[in-house]
From Swiss-Prot:
The keyword Cytoplasm applies. HAMAP family: RimP. PANTHER family: RIBOSOME MATURATION FACTOR RIMP (PTHR33867:SF1). The keyword Nucleus does not apply. It holds the Pfam family RimP_N. It is found in: Cytoplasm. Belongs to the RimP family. One of its GO terms (cellular component) is cytosol. This is Ribosome maturation factor RimP. InterPro entries: Ribosome_maturation_RimP (IPR003728), RimP_C (IPR028998), RimP_C_sf (IPR036847), RimP_N (IPR028989), RimP_N_sf (IPR035956). Required for maturation of 30S ribosomal subunits.
Length: 158
């Protein structure tokens, strides 16, 4: 059986995002991939101040019932609800938009204004350009998402 992971992730995201938003959470990402001997559907959600285990259980109950009705995935899988984590890698432009205002560390593919590593706050995200206010100098850099080799959240004060 041919499995189009991206298509499944897209459909799941379209279906669960309004429900998760209606519960007061933000949908960070959806991942569907083989792990061990089976498949895992990972719903990554967050809210201001962080998400609790009880929140994950509540999301799981609602999302599980919804996915059973929609029947997008025609075989058994493990449903996992999780938070993005404190230093989760930012792998999609949407991730930067999700974490506006937060401190990030970027490793660039090529230097921009003489820098290959940038630590700063996400100011804005528009048309694939991420505006980062440098932590040290306060200067705003306009960095194309395509120029980022690695990006991750940083913990303040470490």
């Amino acid at each position: 059986m041919e499995i189009n992971r991206e298509e499944i992730e897209k459909k799941v995201k379209e279906i669960v995002e309004p429900v998760i938003r209606g519960m007061g959470f933000k949908l960070f990402d959806v991942e569907f991939k083989p792990e061990g001997r089976g498949w895992v559907l990972r719903i990554i959600a967050d809210k201001e101040g962080g998400i609790t285990i009880k929140d994950c259980e509540e999301i799981s109950r609602k999302v599980s019932a919804l996915l059973d009705v929609e029947d997008i995935i025609p075989f058994s899988y493990l449903l996992e609800i999780t938070s993005p984590g404190l230093t989760r890698p930012l792998t999609k432009v949407e991730h930067y938009d999700f974490f506006k205002g937060r401190l990030v560390k970027l490793i660039l593919k090529e230097p921009i204004e003489g820098k290959r590593e940038v630590v700063g706050y996400i100011e804005d995200v528009k048309n694939g350009i991420i505006d980062i206010r440098e932590k040290e100098k306060g200067k705003v850099l306009h960095i194309p998402f395509s120029a980022i080799a690695k990006g991750r959240l940083e913990i303040e004060g470490w």
